[in-house]
Amino acid sequence: MSAILKHSEERLMKVLLAPVISEKATFVAEKNEQVVFLVMPDATKPEIKAAVELLFKVQVESVQVANRQGKQKRSGRFNGRRNHTRRAFVCLKPGQEINFTEEAK
């Protein structure tokens, strides 16, 4: 819990943007017992760990982050690009679980 105290709760509430629900994220969750989140571009590993522990009341073993480049897209003669994203792969300690499919109470 000491990691939570080092960062302000207001900042930690903004670090996690959304869980990633995709075929690849589901495969990683089943095989490696990891959960994937979209996070703020300037979020650090300790902040991500503290935010997950605060919001979901679980213990985090490790955090890996990946910066994904936005895809180049074209509409007619105009070129554009999707936004860059940062994903966090959060490995939970054995016996811990986050279930996004169950109903909110």
Curated annotation (Swiss-Prot):
SUPFAM superfamilies, sorted: Ribosomal proteins S24e, L23 and L15e
One function term, GO molecular function aspect: structural constituent of ribosome
GO CC term, one of those recorded: ribosome
GO BP: any one term: translation
InterPro entries assigned: Nucleotide-bd_a/b_plait_sf, Ribosomal_uL23-like, Ribosomal_uL23/eL15/eS24_sf
Gene3D superfamilies found in the cross-reference section: 3.30.70.330
Keywords noted in UniProt: Ribonucleoprotein, Ribosomal protein, RNA-binding, rRNA-binding
Domain of life: Bacteria
Annotated PANTHER family: 60S RIBOSOMAL PROTEIN L23A
Function description: One of the early assembly proteins it binds 23S rRNA. One of the proteins that surrounds the polypeptide exit tunnel on the outside of the ribosome. Forms the main docking site for trigger factor binding to the ribosome.
Subunit structure: Part of the 50S ribosomal subunit. Contacts protein L29, and trigger factor when it is bound to the ribosome.
Similarity remark: Belongs to the universal ribosomal protein uL23 family.
Protein name (database record): Large ribosomal subunit protein uL23
Gene label: rplW
